[in-house]
Regions:
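ATP-binding/phosphotransfer module of carbohydrate and carboxylate kinases, centering on a glycine-rich
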Residues: 1-58, 67-75, 94-102, 119-126, ...
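Hydrophobic "anchor" residues
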Residues: 24-25, 78, 148-149
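Short clusters of small/polar residues that mark proteolytic maturation junctions
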Residues: 30-32, 83, 153-154
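A cytosolic small-molecule/anion-sensing beta-strand core signal
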Residues: 20, 63, 144-145
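Short beta-strand segments
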Residues: 8, 60-64, 131-137
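A charged helix-plus-loop insertion that forms the helical arch/lid used to bind
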Residues: 73-89
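General beta-strand structural signal in soluble alpha/beta enzymes
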Residues: 104-109
Length: 312
């Protein structure tokens, strides 16, 4: 059975694993992303793969930034660089391929997550599916017939930039990222709890929010639930818009705060409220089917390996 080397380059760490073509994990590890140049990153990646060069048949990399498909750009050039601005314009795929003598593919991290969930997670067996990852913004991707939808400029699936309110002047502070990234939940819950102190707000992370929901006093539980419901309704409204455009069979939602079942209970409950507004000739509007993503922090490695398998 063929073995591949999967790499997930993040802003704080580089995770790696040796993965079979059936998505079984072998050796794995991580190193800090303590690099200041593209050359340093390449040296580190080459050092990680080096001991396995005789064992693996290819290297799949998930990375931040704008990245075209392998067919459109086999050099795996990273545009913008995302969390690693020094990678802007760097042909990571070509440079590492020449260094290692192995096939190398590079895919955007959000798209990698979507393809990973298709290969081995919540989107298995689905013809059209979407993944939305709740972080600082909303990462994600769209999978159609087993391939990630790239779009004409590689920008398909960049859900963070969707505008929330078309009746207001354009404002980067009124996007799906700001309303539905985890800070959006933090801010809504803080308002309900009457928190304005910066230190208190900083302490109100996802873990604390759900801790209060489960173990807080009656007034705290009610306040957190109101904030969570408001967050869920904003999230669901965007999913309904995406349903109209893409019509996926499944939306898989992942990210740190998605681990708590209370989030999905709120998303399901508020989706009923949102869909109740679609009446008359709109009553047959399909209800978005929202499920938890399944692969957690490994999703990008799964997707990186799946991308590499597509070109071997």
């Amino acid at each position: 059975m063929r073995q591949l080397f999967g790499i997930d380059i993040g802003g704080t760490s580089v995770k790696w694993a040796v993965v079979s073509e059936n998505y079984e994990f072998g050796d794995r590890g991580s190193v800090p992303t303590a690099f200041v140049s593209a050359d340093q990153l390449v040296d580190a990646l080459a050092a990680l793969v080096g001991p396995y060069r005789g064992q693996v048949v290819g290297v799949g990399i998930s990375a931040p930034g704008g990245i075209f498909s392998y067919e459109a750009d086999p050099d795996g050039t990273i545009h913008r660089g995302g969390a690693l601005p020094y990678m802007d314009g760097f042909p990571l795929g070509r440079v590492l391929r020449e260094r290692l003598g192995l096939p190398v593919t590079v895919v955007n991290d959000g798209k990698s997550c979507a393809l990973g969930e298709y290969a081995a997670g919540a989107l298995r067996g689905v013809d059209v599916g979407c993944v939305a990852v709740i972080g600082t913004g909303i990462g994600g991707g769209i999978v159609v017939d087993g391939r990630v939808l790239m779009g004409a400029g590689g920008f398909a699936g960049e859900f963070s930039f969707l505008s929330n309110n078309v009746n207001e002047p354009l404002d980067h502070c009124d996007t799906f990222a700001t309303s539905s990234g985890w800070h959006g939940l933090q801010n809504l819950v803080a308002v309900e709890l009457g928190i304005s102190d910066e230190a208190e707000l900083e302490a109100l992370d996802g873990r604390r929010i759900f801790e209060l929901l489960e173990h807080g006093g009656a007034s705290e539980v009610a306040a957190v639930q109101r904030g969570l419901d408001a967050y869920a309704e904003l999230f669901d409204r965007v999913l309904v818009n995406l349903q109209c455009v893409i019509d996926p069979a499944v939306f898989a939602v992942g990210g740190g705060i998605s681990c708590h079942p209370a989030l999905f209970e709120a998303l399901d409950r508020k989706m009923d409220d949102v869909m109740a507004h679609y009446t008359g000739f709109l009553k047959d509007m399909p209800r978005p089917h929202v499920v938890p993503a399944q692969l957690g922090n490994d999703a990008n490695i799964y997707g990186a390996v799946a991308t590499c398998l597509q070109v071997l």
